[in-house]
Regions:
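Extended substrate-binding grooves/exosites of carbohydrate-active enzymes
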Residues: 1-193
Length: 193
C-alpha cells in the first residue's frame, strides 16, 4: 500500500509521525502487504533546501551549462531547483546529509522505501537500511537508462516507474513539455490562456 506521494510534510516530525501511523494502520488491516510512500526530497527538505543549493551551486551551474551566471532570479531559480532532480547535481542532492536527516524517520516506517527523482540515493539506502528494499516511484524519462543500471546492480532496488505520458495532450499544469526550445515545465502562450 502506498500511504502517499510527494507529501511535503513527510520531512517534518509531524509528517513522519503521520506516515508511521498510516503504515501501522495498513499493517493492522492487512499484514500480508508491504507499505511504501513516494518521497520527493525537494518537497520534504522545505527551507533547508537553500543551504544545500548553496553547497551544490557549482554542480548546478555545471549541469545547467551556465558556469558564468550568478543570477538566481526568475526562471534561473526554477531551473536551479529542477537541476536538483536530475544529473550529477541531482545525485549529489539525493545523498546530501540534510536530505538523509529529513527522510530518515519516514524511511524507517515503511517496508519499501519509495523515492521520486532520487536515483542517486538508491544504493545509499542499501547501506542505511540493509533490511529494506527501494523503489523508484517517479523518474524522468531522460534518466531511465542511467537509473536502470542502478536497478540491475542492486538486489535491494526493486525497479522504477517513469513518466511515460511525458507530452500527453491535455496537460494543464507544470508538466507541459515543449520540443521547440521553449522552457519546459511551465506554460507558454497559448497553453497558459
Amino acid at each position: 500500500y502506498s500511504v502517499g506521494n510527494e507529501i511535503q510534510e513527510i520531512g517534518t516530525e509531524r509528517g513522519a509521525e503521520i506516515n508511521r501511523m498510516l503504515c501501522n494502520a495498513f499493517k493492522e488491516l492487512d499484514a500480508t502487504r508491504f507499505t511504501t510512500n513516494g518521497m520527493n526530497a525537494l518537497n520534504a527538505v522545505g527551507a533547508k533546501v537553500y543551504p544545500v543549493m548553496q553547497e551544490l551551486a557549482p554542480l548546478i551551474r555545471k549541469d545547467a551549462g551556465e558556469a558564468g551566471t550568478n543570477d538566481n532570479s526568475g526562471s534561473n531559480a526554477i531551473n536551479s531547483f529542477m537541476k536538483l532532480m536530475e544529473g550529477e547535481a541531482g545525485d549529489a542532492f539525493a545523498v546530501h546529509p540534510i536530505v538523509t536527516e529529513v527522510l530518515e524517520e519516514s524511511s524507517e516506517s515503511m517496508d519499501i522505501i519509495g523515492f521520486n527523482y532520487l536515483t542517486g540515493r538508491h544504493l545509499l539506502e542499501g547501506e542505511l537500511h540493509p533490511n529494506k528494499c527501494v523503489l523508484g516511484t517517479e523518474t524522468f524519462p531522460a534518466d531511465i537508462a542511467r537509473l536502470w543500471k542502478v536497478v540491475n546492480s542492486s538486489k535491494r532496488v526493486l525497479g522504477d516507474f517513469t513518466w511515460t505520458g511525458y507530452d500527453y495532450l491535455g496537460e494543464a499544469g507544470c508538466g507541459i513539455f515543449y520540443y521547440d526550445g521553449k522552457s519546459n515545465f511551465g506554460s507558454n502562450y497559448p497553453d497558459r490562456t
